[in-house]
């Protein structure tokens, strides 16, 4: 079955809504946080059964072990032992981000290429690039990307698009946008030949230009995508993100689920959920955990700080995550980080992921009560 989306409550205070997405592998209560499992695994988190939707990266899975190899083993759900919904990207984000650097690096570098020029050539056919593992030459077209995602068997898939740096040349930005929408149409056409149980979201580009965002919305809305994903460069700070997401969401129909690509830190979630965003993906909680940043209701806690060296309180008093319920103290967790014990990142990641799910439940409750 393709996904079904139902709005259960529309807030009287904002455009925020509580909904439910149903897929062949289960349902997702929205708004939802979607953690990124780059290679099919959440770093530092052993149990993902309580995570409603997980984001896996097609590019990395193509490079190793290969989409066809995963298909031969029954698909991604079987391969990683997950009986719950999965979303995959097209592979384009990783290709272009490896060439230009992360979003933050794009901004700082004003679009100068990073990563040893992994992109060989981009044209209307697709993108020629080098594997980050062994340097072999690879090619990704809209059709190849979608077929790879069909081999993986994710519940929600994305069309191939081109990610540009924040300060891309305006002329090339226009050319890229036009090419991206051609790629998206080709991706959708290929998908619709044999949709199976999968659904495809259209990706809306346009940078920080409101008129381009509106054009992107019209493009996606006019095609039979199952949902909408707000993608591309969203600006250089939270204010830019809020402005871009606000304009974009206002030009999308309410009937389709809306996903915000690559944005899932708590300040951004709180700032944009009121626009009616239904899901947010990010590696934020696990990456923060590996660097000793602990998420709490009182704000982030830098566990490496000397003040926690003899603190025998749980990581967060009152928290029911596995780490806190097993009595992992702040002093002990700090010690593990200081001696570079791998368990440090594991306990911190378990806590941070639990915290994100807790915050999303609170957000849904706030919307249901018209407080958000």
UniProtKB/Swiss-Prot annotation:
Its EC number is 2.4.2.29. The keyword Plastid does not apply. Substrate binds at residues 89-93, 161, 232. InterPro entries: TGT (IPR004803), TGT-like_sf (IPR036511), tRNA_ribo_trans-like (IPR002616). Transmembrane segments: none annotated. Zn(2+) binds at residues 319, 321, 324, 351. Pfam families: TGT (PF01702). It is an enzyme of class 2 (transferase). Its cofactor is Zn(2+). Residues 262-268, 286-290 are annotated as: RNA binding. SUPFAM superfamilies: tRNA-guanine transglycosylase. Binds 1 zinc ion per subunit. NCBIfam families: Q_tRNA_tgt, tgt_general. PANTHER family: PTHR43468, TRNA-GUANOSINE(34) QUEUINE TRANSGLYCOSYLASE. Catalyzes the base-exchange of a guanine (G) residue with the queuine precursor 7-aminomethyl-7-deazaguanine (PreQ1) at position 34 (anticodon wobble position) in tRNAs with GU(N) anticodons (tRNA-Asp, -Asn, -His and -Tyr). Catalysis occurs through a double-displacement mechanism. The nucleophile active site attacks the C1' of nucleotide 34 to detach the guanine base from the RNA, forming a covalent enzyme-RNA intermediate. The proton acceptor active site deprotonates the incoming PreQ1, allowing a nucleophilic attack on the C1' of the ribose to form the product. Homodimer. Within each dimer, one monomer is responsible for RNA recognition and catalysis, while the other monomer binds to the replacement base PreQ1. Belongs to the queuine tRNA-ribosyltransferase family. This is Queuine tRNA-ribosyltransferase. It comes from Chlamydia trachomatis serovar A (strain ATCC VR-571B / DSM 19440 / HAR-13). The gene is tgt.
């Amino acid at each position: 079955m393709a996904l079904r989306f139902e709005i259960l409550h529309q807030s009287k205070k904002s455009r925020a809504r509580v909904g439910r997405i149903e897929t062949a592998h289960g349902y997702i209560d929205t708004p939802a946080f979607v953690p990124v499992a780059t290679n099919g695994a959440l770093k530092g988190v052993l149990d993902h059964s309580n995570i409603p939707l997980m984001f896996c990266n097609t590019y990395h899975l193509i490079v190793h072990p290969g989409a066809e190899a995963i298909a031969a083993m029954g698909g991604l759900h079987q391969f990683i032992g997950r009986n719950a919904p999965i979303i995959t990207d097209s592979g384009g984000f990783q290709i272009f981000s490896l060439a230009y650097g992360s979003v933050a690096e794009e901004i700082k570098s004003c679009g100068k290429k990073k990563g040893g020029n992994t992109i060989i050539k981009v044209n209307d056919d697709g993108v020629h690039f080098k594997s980050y593992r062994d340097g072999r030459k690879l090619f990704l077209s809209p059709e190849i990307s979608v077929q790879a995602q069909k081999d993986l068997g994710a519940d929600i898939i994305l069309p191939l698009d081109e990610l540009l740096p924040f300060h891309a040349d305006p002329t090339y930005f226009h050319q890229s946008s036009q090419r991206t929408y051609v790629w998206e149409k080709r991706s959708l056409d290929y998908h619709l030949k044999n949709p199976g149980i999968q659904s495809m979201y259209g990706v809306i580009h346009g940078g920080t230009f409101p008129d381009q965002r509106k054009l992107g919305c019209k493009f996606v809305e006019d095609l039979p995508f199952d949902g909408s994903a707000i993608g591309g460069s969203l600006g250089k700070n939270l204010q830019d993100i809020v402005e871009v997401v606000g304009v974009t969401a206002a030009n999308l129909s309410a009937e389709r689920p809306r996903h915000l690509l690559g944005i899932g830190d708590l300040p951004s979630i709180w700032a944009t959920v009121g626009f009616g965003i239904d899901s947010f993906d990010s590696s934020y909680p696990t990456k923060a955990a590996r660097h000793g940043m602990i998420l709490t209701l009182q704000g982030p806690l830098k566990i490496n700080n000397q003040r926690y060296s003899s603190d025998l309180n749980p990581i967060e008093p009152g928290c029911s995550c596995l780490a806190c319920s097993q009595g992992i103290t702040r002093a002990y967790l700090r010690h593990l980080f200081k001696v570079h014990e791998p368990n440090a990142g594991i306990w911190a990641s378990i806590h941070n992921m639990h915290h994100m799910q807790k915050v999303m439940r609170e957000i849904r409750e706030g919307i249901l009560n018209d407080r958000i």
